[in-house]
Structures are given as C-alpha cells and as structure tokens.
Swiss-Prot record:
An annotated Gene Ontology molecular function: electron transporter, transferring electrons within the cyclic electron transport pathway of photosynthesis activity
Membrane disposition: Multi-pass membrane protein
Role description: One of the components of the core complex of photosystem II (PSII). It binds chlorophyll and helps catalyze the primary light-induced photochemical processes of PSII. PSII is a light-driven water:plastoquinone oxidoreductase, using light energy to abstract electrons from H(2)O, generating O(2) and a proton gradient subsequently used for ATP formation.
Subunit structure comment from the entry: PSII is composed of 1 copy each of membrane proteins PsbA, PsbB, PsbC, PsbD, PsbE, PsbF, PsbH, PsbI, PsbJ, PsbK, PsbL, PsbM, PsbT, PsbX, PsbY, PsbZ, Psb30/Ycf12, peripheral proteins PsbO, CyanoQ (PsbQ), PsbU, PsbV and a large number of cofactors. It forms dimeric complexes.
Record protein name field: Photosystem II CP47 reaction center protein
SUPFAM superfamilies on file: Photosystem II antenna protein-like
Domain of life: Bacteria
C-alpha cells in the first residue's frame, strides 16, 4: 500500500479479524516481556539479605508486583522475607510449585505463546462470518456491544480478584505490613465496607472496592449488551467509528497511569515500602526519625540505658532513615539500581550523638532531598548553631577543633565507642548528614557513590511520562473522530467513500474496484 510508518494502522481500520489479531499479538508481547523480565530479575537478584539489600535497592521492577499479590518464594529455596522454603510436591505431584516466582514467570511465557498462535490464526483467517454485518454483507464491528462485553469481562475479573484472591477464599491474599514497613507478610484480607475503607492505607478498602467495582462493571456490561444507544447519541459520539473506541481506550489507560503514578509516589497500601522503597516525603518529614526517637524515649522511660535503647531499634527501621533510600535522590539520567550508587549496605554503625566542649548535645542538620551538597551544621536542642565544618578555615568560628566536638555511638556495630579525633568526628558528621550511618560495600558492583532512585521512582517517572503522552493521544484521536467530517470535508457517515484503495477515483462510487 505504500503507507508511511505512522499510517500503517489504517490497514486494520476496516478489517475486524486482523484488528483482533494485532491486539492478540500486543497481549502476547506484553506477557512475553513480563515473563522474560521476571526470569532475568530472578537470575540477578540476591536474596541473601532481605533487610539491608531488599529488592527495591537492587533495581527489581516486576518482582515487587508479583510479591504484593502473594508470590513470596522461589524454586531456588528462598523467600522474600528471608526464611528458607521447602519445595513440596505441587501440580501432578511434581516438585514445582507454580505459585512461585519461576512458576508465574513461566505461565506468562506459555500464555504469551498461546496468544501469539491465536494472533497468527486470526491474521490468516480474518474473514469470519462473526465480523459480517448481515444487513450489508460488509465487515463491521458492533462497537457498543463490544464495549458491553469488555465491561462485563473486566467486572467479572475484578469481582473475582476481590472476592477470592484477596480474601483468601481461593487465593493467597495480599502483602500487608505495619505503618513503618517492618512486619510485611502475605495475609487474607476481609473487605472493609465502612468509611475506613476509603483510607488509602487500609487493605480492606482494596478488597471492598474491587468487589464493588466488579459488580458495578458487570451491571454496566449487561446494560450495554442489551440496550442500544439512542441514534442521536450514537451519531454525536461517533460510536460507529473504531477511532472513537481508540480514543476512549487511551483515556482509560492514561487515567489509570496518572492514578498509579500518584499512589506510587505519595504512598499507598498497594505500594508498600518493603517492596518499593520509602517515599520521598518520609525523608522530608522525618517520618522514621520520629518513630525511632519515640521508641528510644519509651525505652529510656522504662529505665534502659542509651546503649540498650538504641540497640533495641530494628536495623530495618534504621535503614529506612537514610537519605540514600529516598526515591527523590535519583537525579536525572542516572541509570541503574540504588546498589550501583552508594553500594550494598552491610551493617548499621549505630546512632551518633555529638557533644561540644561545653557538654551540649548536638545534632547534625540533615541533607534535604533536592540538595547534592549541603553544609555540615550542628545545632543544639534549641536550634542554635554550635559547630560546623567550615568552607573557609581562616574565618572559622565553629570548627570542630575550636568547639571540641566529640561523637559517641549507641547501638549498631560501634555501640559504646567514642571518637575525639576531629578528623574522625568530621567523617561521622558527614555520614550523619545523610541519616543513620551504615557501612557499604562499593567494590562488588563498582558503585560510584552517586545516588540512584528506587523502583518507586522509576515506576512513577515512567507512568507519569506515558500518561502525559497518552493524554495528548486521547485529545488527538478524540478530535479526529468527533470532527472527522470537518477535517475530511465530507459527512462522517460516508467513510466508505474515502477508504484507501476501495475506489479508483476517491469518492466516486461508480469506480469501485472489484
């Protein structure tokens, strides 16, 4: 036909069989990518330390999504929570449990192959009676009825996902955790039908809304399968034009993309920090700092020493309170996982407490999210600056040497140790600026010391960008179908006359090609 690359889709505009074929092929490609990507991630994933080297620091993208739906173990014998897994006989007594990372990946690949074969079949056998309008004998699609069918099927899947998979009636449930991402596990969830169900961090709301949305969609599907749209509405919204369906579908996709970009970036029960990493706002607001301090104060009130109080802090909680885990530290065009930046975390050094020569307890002002460099400033309990690392020594008034700053560690690997050498104290002050101090292995991966973003940042960036592109795609195709008669200069219902290649002379019905 000699069509340019950006016009090739016109080949399926009036060919329902092959329109179906290309959609089947698209689904096959998506399934194939998902399964292949899962196998690749499993090949490079290191499950040895679920606390300091979780999947979101290793740049895993599809594994977190599998995990939040209830997949937690691998055929290799490990689980995402750190416990070993004993492989028991599964389907047909085979020692391969298909509700595992490898099992789900392989099922996607097998299904991809089946969809590929279906696409080939429908491309070859495109001229089916199913797609023929009995009134005209021409290929046609009853788009309003197809819309109803899609609504019903979508509602059926949505309802069953909420009713069976999430509740555990026939399924594993979903990933749930506490507010600080410490106790993550898979759990059967009961639906929450009250106002609490609208809390974005209440898993019961996810179940209830899937059930309710499924019922609503099925009702809508039955309605559109049984009722015909009014003629004026059918004409006004160009319901007979497949480009209308395209514009509507794009709207659904970009709407969903904007929503999930928001739930990922701002945090939601479906995007737990144990699987996707903390949000940037948890660093901005000192979310984990406050919880750690609350726990320490509680221990001190019960008579514990500073060392005992800080030693009771879970290493996992301390690790969240580190700026290198904020997705906003990724920077533009910094490819790779977080581990490729600051390295693989090995151990918590402990909580540093600074003190000046006058005996005042000092704290280091922490690095804001959007700064790469920030002055090292130490303030007392009233916020008064008492020490710093000066840019110009000749004008220094608050240098560590002048103010006699020392540092003592409580909890962690350096528990009970005090450092008085100014060079050592400065080193730990620079680390304290980034949050809790950790030792990192930078040699294994050749880490370059430049922060990267987490899975949360990549997902948000990708979906926000594509949502914007699809938004303009919706405007483009929606305008084309609504104002087709204006753009083409003819009535919208005379599409046959301008079909490419149907007539020797465009629009002349007497020159139809046989």
């Amino acid at each position: 036909m000699g069509l340019p690359w950006y016009r090739v889709h016109t080949a399926v505009i009036n060919d329902p069989g092959r329109l179906l074929a290309v959609h089947l092929m698209h689904t096959a490609l998506v399934l194939g990518w998902a399964g292949s990507m899962a196998l690749y991630e499993l090949a490079v994933f290191d499950p040895s330390d679920a606390v300091l080297n979780p999947m979101w620091r290793q740049g895993m993208f599809v594994l977190p999504f599998m995990t939040r739906l209830g997949v937690t173990h691998s055929w290799s014998g490990w689980t995402v929570t750190g416990e070993p897994w004993i492989n028991e006989p599964g389907f047909l007594n085979a020692h391969f449990n298909f509700w595992s990372y490898e099992g789900v990946a392989l099922m996607h690949i097998v299904l991809s192959g089946l969809f590929f074969l279906a696409a080939v079949w429908h491309w070859v056998y495109w001229d089916l009676d199913l797609f023929e309008d009995p009134r005209t004998g021409e290929p046609a699609l009853d788009l309003p009825k197809i819309f109803g069918g899609h609504l019903f099927l979508l509602g059926f899947l949505c309802f069953n996902f909420g009713t069976f998979h999430l509740t555990g009636i026939f399924g594993p449930g979903m990933w749930v955790s506490d507010a600080y991402g410490l106790t993550g596990h898979i759990e059967h969830i009961a639906p929450e039908w009250g106002p609490a169900g609208f809390n974005p961090f209440n898993p019961g709301g996810v179940v209830a809304h899937h059930i309710a949305a499924g019922i609503t969609l099925m009702i809508g599907g039955v309605f559109h399968l049984t009722a015909r749209p009014p003629e004026r509405l059918y004409t006004a919204l160009r319901m007979g034009n497949v480009e209308t369906a395209l514009a509507s579908a794009i709207a659904a996709v970009f709407g969903a993309a904007f929503v999930v970009a928001g739930t990922m970036w701002y945090g939601h029960v479906t995007t737990p920090i144990e699987l996707f990493g903390p949000t940037r706002y948890q660093w901005d607001q000192g979310y984990f700092t406050q919880e750690i301090q609350r726990r320490v104060d509680s221990q001190l009130a019960e008579g514990a020493s500073l060392s005992e109080a800080w030693s009771s802090i879970p290493e996992k909680l301390a690790f969240y309170d580190y700026v290198g885990n904020s997705p906003a530290k990724g920077g533009l065009f910094r490819v790779g996982a977080m581990d490729s930046g600051d390295g693989i975390a090995e151990e918590w050094l402990g909580h540093p407490v600074f003190q000046d020569g006058a005996g005042r307890a000092l704290s280091v002002r922490r690095l804001p999210n959007f700064f790469e460099n920030f002055p090292v400033i130490l303030t007392d309990g009233d916020g008064v600056v008492r020490a710093d690392i000066p840019f110009r020594r000749s004008e220094s008034q608050y240098s560590f040497e002048q103010t006699g700053v020392t540092v003592s560690f409580y909890g962690g690997a350096l528990d009970g140790q005090t450092f008085t050498n100014p060079s050592d104290v400065k080193k730990f002050a620079r680390r304290a600026q980034l949050g809790e101090a950790f030792d990192f292995d930078t040699e294994t991966l050749g880490s370059d010391g430049v922060f990267r973003t987490s899975t949360r940042g990549w997902f948000t960036f990708g979906h926000a960008c594509f949502a914007l592109l699809f938004f303009f795609g919706h405007i483009w195709h929606g305008a084309r179908t609504l104002f087709r008669d204006v753009f083409a200069g003819i009535d919208a219902d005379l599409g046959e006359q301008i079909e490419f290649g149907a007539f020797q002379k465009l629009g002349d019905l007497t020159t139809r090609k046989s």
